[in-house]
């Protein structure tokens, strides 16, 4: 399973990319606004760091506006993927863009119906939001299992990106269910490195080594 980093923070992207953990990046207008920088400049810099796909979201809500924005976004770098909202207008745009060879990531997916429709329209990726479903009293991971099964049944090439990841368990469940990608906030990815028994083991090794050095 691929790890995408869900952030527009260039320093964090560099940090985790140096560890070999970043297969791609997803951004949205909120994440970029937090950086206080020009939208296009941020996307270009991220694309220069990461070899994999970098999702950049359109702002327009009408198909014509989305298509126009998408054509401009893909001029920024070869690895830009255009993020499109799951609406009728969004899928209309996806249908046009896919025929032009422009990769798309349909976001704000909350049902298998939506994922299937996005795939039919030609989406490269679909992004179901598991954390937000959990917040709404549903089990977000059930949706991932459902989408993966449907796509497997029919050999659908659209990749499933598990989004709105809240904790490391979401990541492991995504891998168990066969999702193609989990897009992970850096705070969650950072937690995945740690386990108390690892810390305890290192502490024990160091004590043993110090004791050995004393007795030499």
Swiss-Prot record:
It comes from the Archaea. GO terms for cellular component: cytoplasm. GO terms for biological process: carbohydrate metabolic process; pentose-phosphate shunt. Pfam families: TAL_FSA. Its EC number is 2.2.1.2. The keyword Nucleotidyltransferase does not apply. One of its GO terms (molecular function) is transaldolase activity. The active site is at 83 (schiff-base intermediate with substrate). Gene3D superfamilies: Aldolase class I (3.20.20.70). Its main location: cytoplasm. Pathway: Carbohydrate degradation; pentose phosphate pathway; D-glyceraldehyde 3-phosphate and beta-D-fructose 6-phosphate from D-ribose 5-phosphate and D-xylulose 5-phosphate (non-oxidative stage): step 2/3. It is found in: Cytoplasm. InterPro entries: Aldolase_TIM (IPR013785), TAL/FSA (IPR001585), Transaldolase_3B (IPR022999), Transaldolase_3B/F6P_aldolase (IPR004731), Transaldolase_AS (IPR018225), TSA/FSA_arc/bac (IPR033919). It catalyses: D-sedoheptulose 7-phosphate + D-glyceraldehyde 3-phosphate = D-erythrose 4-phosphate + beta-D-fructose 6-phosphate. PANTHER family: FRUCTOSE-6-PHOSPHATE ALDOLASE 1-RELATED, TRANSALDOLASE. NCBIfam families: fsa_talC_mipB. HAMAP family: Transaldolase_3b (MF_00494). Belongs to the transaldolase family. Type 3B subfamily. This is Probable transaldolase. It comes from Methanococcus aeolicus (strain ATCC BAA-1280 / DSM 17508 / OCM 812 / Nankai-3). The lineage of its organism: Archaea, Methanobacteriati, Methanobacteriota, Methanomada group, Methanococci. The gene is tal.
């Amino acid at each position: 399973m691929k790890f995408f980093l869900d952030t527009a923070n260039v320093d964090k992207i560099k940090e985790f990319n140096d560890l070999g953990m970043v297969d791609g990046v997803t951004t949205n207008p909120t994440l970029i606004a937090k950086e206080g920088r020009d939208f296009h400049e941020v996307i270009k810099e991220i694309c220069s760091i990461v070899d994999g796909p970098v999702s950049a979201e359109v702002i327009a809500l009408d198909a014509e506006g989305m298509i126009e924005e998408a054509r401009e976004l893909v001029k920024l770098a070869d690895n830009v993927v255009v993020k499109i909202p799951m609406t009728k207008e969004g899928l209309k745009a996806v249908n046009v863009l896919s025929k032009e060879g422009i990769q798309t990531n349909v976001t704000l997916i909350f049902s298998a119906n939506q994922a299937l429709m996005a795939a039919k329209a030609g989406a490269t990726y679909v992004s179901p939001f598991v954390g937000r479903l959990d917040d709404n009293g549903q089990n977000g991971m059930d949706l991932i299992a459902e989408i993966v099964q449907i796509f497997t049944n029919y050999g659908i090439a659209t990749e499933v990106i598990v989004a709105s990841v809240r904790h490391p368990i979401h990541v492991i469940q995504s891998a168990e269910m066969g999702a193609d990608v989990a897009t992970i906030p850096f705070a969650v990815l950072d937690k995945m490195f740690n386990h108390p028994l690892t810390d305890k083991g290192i502490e024990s090794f160091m004590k043993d080594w110090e004791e050995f050095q004393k007795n030499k």
